[in-house]
A protein has these predicted regions:
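Short, flexible helix-loop junctions that flank or precede catalytic/ligand sites
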Residues: 1-290
Length: 290
């Protein structure tokens, strides 16, 4: 941790030996900038489409159950949870988090940092949290079966649990928990919804150029050419406003699976994934591809 220009900056350093010397990766956390961004962070700014935003808000206002956010590393999962905490943080409820690391401190929220050297793991921390009379719990990440089991039991016993797990889409989450040996009945009984997300770059509005996409490119993207052949497309160019990159900022695209009774019954019956996906889309789910 360093003080630079009256700012507190944290550095997470990972060093790995290689045949050509040490490979170093540094993650920079500007806490003052994060504080400014998070203080103004609302779910509307994440990038939800209106229907997914409405459904996600409904899920995080339920008194109990589990809300799962999934995606690869660096897809904005923690930012989404922080936006949810900003809306959930009221005087009526006691909210406790366990994170690795705590990237931003919320007023009125009990936040616990993971410290494996001192024995504070996600699983042990979560067990301790349950003895502190929480109403809502945020678990930074589910990494093992023990943490998953405790989180599920917490959701089944009257707590709202928000957490993340690494998976490619909303349906892979089910397989991920199954691979941990988690009982499907309890897992589905606890689960309110699954949100999958990705971060995409935004074309610089100052220099983006209008182009006509080629048929091969449209089809390679998994889109129907006849449907999108007249759609205007833009591409990055680069200017002084975006430092020649062609992009300015990022936004989130989402895929929201509401665990309705019909979806749960299909999963319990081990119906093919294609049928479950078709049912979810019929119920209004917008996929990441869409």
């Amino acid at each position: 941790r360093m003080r630079l220009d009256r700012k507190t900056v944290d550095f997470r350093v990972s060093i790995l030996p290689s045949v050509f010397g040490e490979s170093v990766v540094i993650r920079i956390l500007d806490r003052d900038s994060i504080a400014t961004g998070v203080s103004d962070l609302k779910l509307e700014r994440i990038g939800f489409n209106p229907e997914d935003l409405k459904r996600f808000r409904k899920a995080i206002t339920r008194p109990y159950g589990m809300v799962l956010v999934t995606g690869p590393t660096g897809s904005g999962k923690t930012t989404t949870l922080y936006a949810a905490i900003s809306e959930m943080n009221t005087l009526e409820d006691k909210l406790i988090t366990i994170e690795d690391p705590v990237e931003y401190q919320f007023s009125g929220v009990v936040q616990i940092p993971v410290n494996e050297k001192k024995g504070v793991t996600f699983a042990r921390g979560l067990r301790s949290i349950l003895r502190h009379d929480p109403d809502k719990i945020m678990v930074g990440e589910i990494r093992d079966a023990e943490t998953a089991q405790i989180a599920i039991q917490s959701a089944l016993t009257g707590h709202l649990v928000l957490t993340t797990v690494h998976a490619n889409n909303v349906f892979d989450v089910i397989g991920r928990f199954a691979s941990m040996g988690i009982d499907a009945y309890n897992f589905l009984a606890a689960l309110n919804c699954v949100l999958a997300q990705r971060l995409v770059r935004i074309l610089c509005p100052s220099c983006r150029t209008l182009v006509k996409a080629q048929q091969a490119l449209i089809e390679e993207s998994g889109l129907d050419y006849e449907q999108y052949k007249e759609t205007p497309f833009h591409e990055a160019k680069g200017c002084s406003q975006c430092h020649g990159t062609g992009y300015r900022g990022r936004k989130c695209i989402t895929e929201f699976l509401d665990l309705t009774d019909e979806i749960k019954e299909m999963i319990h019956a081990e119906r093919p994934l294609s049928e479950i996906r078709y049912r979810a889309v019929t119920d209004g789910m917008i996929t990441l591809r869409q």
